[in-house]
A protein has these predicted regions:
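N-terminal leader/targeting segments and the immediate start of mature chains
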Residues: 1-39, 46-51, 176-187
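Short beta-strand segments that buttress and anchor functional surface loops
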Residues: 27-29, 53-57, 118-125, 146-150
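Flexible, processing/modification-adjacent segments and terminal tails
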Residues: 7-24, 38, 67-131, 186
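An acidic-aromatic
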Residues: 44-91, 151-156
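Short, surface-exposed coil-to-beta transition loops
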Residues: 38-42, 56-57, 64-65, 128-133, ...
């Protein structure tokens, strides 16, 4: 068991890496509730700071720090919005670590193999909307391996598959084809 100062240092280093580097990974999101069987959704993600690109099934989403792009291939429609903080949290679960670090009780434990650290953030005030945020990082490089959010009876789990940091300039927007219907809902 590490002390609180060490845990906060790990979280700080992890968040600094996400701000200064570009993380790329395939992933699987698992949504489970007490009543229903778990649902799994594979996808790909690219994250740098608050910016991200996300692909899941027939949906692509991107955020460039100002505009949210949401493309649905089934309807060939691109929607542009100014997202709310809640929408950004739902699209990029690592934002929870940043948003909750100052308002949570923080605990830590080692994974079974000892190669990863599991950090649990439990809000001191349950009016925040979530019951628990769990972040699992690889010890050698603080690479995120898993994030889990518990909201009431629902658990959303994001499991990374071979995450890595990539170099070079990345595009965090979706450029529509000429035939794509663009729905600009920005204020």
């Amino acid at each position: 068991m590490k002390g609180l100062v060490v845990i906060l240092s790990i979280l700080s280093s992890f968040l600094t890496n996400l701000e200064t580097k570009t993380l790329q990974s395939d992933f699987t999101i698992t949504i489970s509730e007490e009543v229903n069987a778990p649902m799994n959704f594979p996808g790909k993600i690219l994250i740098q700071g608050d910016k991200f690109c996300l692909e899941m099934m027939d949906i692509k989403a991107a955020y460039n720090g100002k505009t949210m792009y949401m493309y649905t291939s089934q309807t060939d429609e691109l929607t542009l919005t100014n997202p709310t903080e809640q929408e950004l949290l739902e699209a990029n679960p690592f934002r929870y670590a940043k948003a909750l670090v100052d308002v949570c009780n923080i605990t830590e434990k080692a994974s079974q193999d000892g190669k990863q650290t599991i950090i649990t953030l439990t809000p001191k005030d349950q009016s925040i909307g979530i019951n628990r945020f769990v972040l699992q990082v690889r010890n050698e490089d603080l690479m995120p391996m898993k994030a889990e959010i518990k909201e009431g009876k629902k658990i959303s789990s994001l499991k990374m598959k071979e995450p890595k940091y990539v170099s070079g300039e990345q595009q965090f927007e979706i450029v529509p084809e000429k035939s794509t219907f663009v729905n600009d809902m920005r204020l």
